[in-house]
């Protein structure tokens, strides 16, 4: 990369097969040996920077911790905070580990010196391309115990089991498209007389739930939210629960929601959706309840009152409700539009790269736009801090 030496560490056969640029070495032992292994690599190659995708996995944390001690710069890629045409690239950490401040005044002041961003250059990223990448990467997973005996996946289920459940759920999603679209039409049509709140589900296996919230899984989130809604929301309001589009279907959320609704005596006030058009729901809802999903950012784009139950980079006074969930249902506070505009521009300027991970054009854009960010002496966030 621009004359820089790159040394990659492979942890699985998928890593090995996917990398053809050279300079790779395989780590086959257990995670307990990683701190010493990384220290050896740092010393041998005089490492100045490390590059990760995500920063919560067991194979990543020892590298991040060592980098902090050694004064090595950490560049973390992640899905975009403002999708679909941006990816995240931050120094130090992403999401709840981000270095972005939580002070609204800082965003208002910093916004004066950054450009006004639109949605970025667009590109097409068909889902089948992403699925193909995933299948090709995991095709070799069954051989990992033989060639990488120390590796333990951060995902709690095997690729084969995951794909089988995806197939089953895809059939369910196809069957539910028309009924769910009709449910959305009815809910939206009646929203003036029967306001609704929206709870978009996240993936239980996501690091956002496991590391950046106090919830153990989405079942815990559902029970907490429905219990609070039943006890504290106005009787004429509805709670709409929408499943995550990439949920593999290990948990029957529809059955769970029905069971909890019966338990809390709100069966006629809860609507469960397996699929559906999220922007339509966001355009008419009275409020959004999320743990820390990027849907929270989309809710702010739609000027929706929003509460984040976990640790989210957008959770701050003026953007999200700062009180407890029990109070949220009756104390609706819309986000400050001007603050959100400033927040969005600053976040894009300091952490977002125009591009994508799952199609050739998007990848080429991301690489081209990421190189100057990674090779700069100071990050955009550091430059803003110096100006302040």
What is the predicted function of each stretch?
Residues 1-12:
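N-terminal subdomain of nucleotide-sugar transferases
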Residues 11-107:
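Active-site and donor-binding regions of nucleotide-sugar-utilizing enzymes
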Residues 29-45, 245, 250-294, 301:
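Donor nucleotide-activated moiety binding/catalytic core segment of transferases
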Residues 48-49, 196, 238, 287:
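Structural motif
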Residues 49-59, 274-320:
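A donor-sugar binding/catalytic signature common to diverse glycosyltransferases
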Residues 75-174:
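Active-site-proximal region of nucleotide-activated glycan assembly enzymes
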Residues 100-146, 319-388:
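Leloir-type glycosyltransferase catalytic cores
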Residues 148, 152-256:
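Conserved catalytic-core segment of nucleotide-activated headgroup transferases in glycan assembly
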